[in-house]
Amino acid sequence: MVSSRPRRRKRASATQLYQTCKAAGTCPPDVVNKVEQTTVADQILKWGSMGVFFGGLGIGSGSGSGGRAGYVPLSTGSRAIPPKSLAPDVIARPPVVVDTVAPTDPSIVSLIEESSIIQSGAPSPVIPTEGGFSITSSGTDVPAILDISSTNTVHVTSTTHHNPIFTDPSVVQPIPPVEASGRIIVSHSSITTGAAEEIPMDTFVVHSDPLSSTPVPGVSARPKVGLYSKALQQVEIVDPTFMSTPQRLITYDNPVFDNIEDTLHFEQPSIHNAPDPAFMDIITLHRPALTSRRGVVRFSRVGQRGTMYTRRGTRIGGRVHFFKDISPIASSEEIELHPLVASPNNSDLFDVYADIDDIDENILYSTIDNNTPTSTYSLYPGNSTRIANTSIPLATIPDTFLTSGPDIVFPSVPAGTPYLPVSPSIPAISVLIRGTDYYLNPAYYFRKRRKRILAY
């Protein structure tokens, strides 16, 4: 429980009261005596100090520290301190002379002592003042002059043909001969002098194999777009212009072309009516986003309103989520599929690629029961692969021999003589069949009639 006791206000000091009430003459006596030092204690100190002088003992209204040197007993005198003797093997240093500084001397004292200049490095060369030495020769003849006649220039050309088919690239070709004079033209791929050096090369292989036996694919979390929070006002837009040119719903002006995929900024006057009332006071329209909400594809943009102005000129307002549903997401169609289940009986399985000689003839000529509308028959040799059977619905028909596949040839049974009626309803025509051709009986040939010519 919090106490409801009022706080105690600090009282003004005596000095503050004296400054405010002295001019009005309403100061209390104790405040005036304390500030003006006219109390009884102050008067005793003033009268006593006229006849008694205590010096620097510190006796007074201050702290009783006994002055700078402290309290010293009056009956005891000072004690002499014997000088310290030095060890016999220690040599005392000469005393340091202290230079006194007169009041007229400069206040800045140089601490750098003057020292002699020491020259370092090699000594400077000494130039002789006397003349140089003279050269004497035993001969007095004229010096010999060699006559070097100019000769014709000889051009030496050396060409090396490099055939990569018959030359090993690792073999270093010899350097062509070099003459003292002339021009040398060398044609080769490369020249290596000295022993060849083998540099180990590392193969850079990008390993895409997993580093662990059970790798977990790293799926980066997609940023969550908070478009449906309580801080955003939800406004549905029906006009399709919102998707192509949203600036037409905010301002009547024709601004310079802006990329609608980026954030749009609008500078509107204080009094402005937007073409669409839903976009009133919109100063910023952020970039679009495609989301899915309750089975539909939704086109969304977040806008910032500038409803109020602050004293500094800043516009503040709420945030709005404008959205338009594009199209619904159709649910997936369900297709009824028949399960492919193998027969529990292994004797009903048959491999269509098995050898026909290994199949029992009793199975080949087995018949199908007429009373069963749907039957499954297949053959199964022991060494063949297990294959799932297939159910085929059959109608009620006479007995039929089973054919298991197109790759199996069964023996055919010869058919009997077709039945002919005893008394045919139409006369039979005799046809003689001989080989691949036939002809009618000459008795059935019609005679050629002569065409009569009528005279007019």
Swiss-Prot record:
Location of this chain's protein in the cell: Virion; Host nucleus; Host early endosome; Host Golgi apparatus
Short motif Nuclear localization signal, span: 1-12, 446-454
InterPro entries with a match to the protein in the record: Late_L2
Signal peptide: none
Alphabetized UniProt keyword annotations: Capsid protein, Cytoplasmic inwards viral transport, Disulfide bond, DNA-binding, Host endosome, Host Golgi apparatus, Host nucleus, Host-virus interaction, Late protein, Microtubular inwards viral transport, Phosphoprotein, Viral penetration into host nucleus, Virion, Virus entry into host cell
Disulphide connectivity of cysteines: 21-27
Function: Minor protein of the capsid that localizes along the inner surface of the virion, within the central cavities beneath the L1 pentamers. Plays a role in capsid stabilization through interaction with the major capsid protein L1. Once the virion enters the host cell, L2 escorts the genomic DNA into the nucleus by promoting escape from the endosomal compartments and traffic through the host Golgi network.
Subunit composition and interactions: Interacts with major capsid protein L1. Interacts with E2; this interaction inhibits E2 transcriptional activity but not the DNA replication function E2. Interacts with host GADD45GIP1. Interacts with host HSPA8; this interaction is required for L2 nuclear translocation. Interacts with host importins KPNB2 and KPNB3. Forms a complex with importin alpha2-beta1 heterodimers via interaction with the importin alpha2 adapter. Interacts with host DYNLT1; this interaction is essential for virus intracellular transport during entry.
Family: Belongs to the papillomaviridae L2 protein family.
The protein, known as: Minor capsid protein L2
Organism taxonomic ancestry: Viruses, Monodnaviria, Shotokuvirae, Cossaviricota, Papovaviricetes
